[in-house]
């Protein structure tokens, strides 16, 4: 079985942890701080998703991920729907392929060519 074929189906995935850093440039100096990494041992999945979506709506950050547009963000959206969470922060510009609000490094490295993605080789 190929690594790509054995990868977890997005519709079956559950959120176990959401970790994020916030980088802000103030007077030419970058400041990086953790937004935390709560996990399901601390809070239920619906609270993790709701809190993250609220932070996105509040901060309007540019997201940087690796394969986030193909896996992480769709999983968050599916799980929000399953839990009945209104998550406007998860339906914004982050899902548009060439968005300036979400930089997916996997897509960038592959020049947006699905055949050139390195995900299957990483796992």
Question: Where are the predicted features?
Answer:
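Metal-dependent phosphoesterase core characteristic of DEDDh/y 3'-5' exonuclease domains
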Residues: 13-42, 54, 58-123
């Amino acid at each position: 079985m190929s690594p790509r074929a054995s990868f977890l189906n997005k519709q079956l995935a559950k959120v176990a942890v959401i970790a994020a850093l916030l980088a802000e440039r103030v007077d030419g100096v970058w400041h990086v701080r953790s937004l935390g990494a709560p996990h399901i041992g601390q809070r239920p999945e619906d609270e993790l998703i709701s809190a993250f979506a609220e932070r996105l709506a509040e901060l309007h950050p540019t997201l940087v991920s690796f394969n986030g547009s193909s896996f992480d963000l769709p999983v968050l959206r599916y799980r929000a729907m399953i839990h009945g969470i209104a998550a406007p922060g998860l339906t914004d510009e982050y899902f548009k392929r060439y968005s300036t609000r979400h930089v997916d490094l996997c897509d960038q490295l592959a020049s947006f060519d699905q055949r050139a993605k390195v995900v299957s080789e990483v796992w």
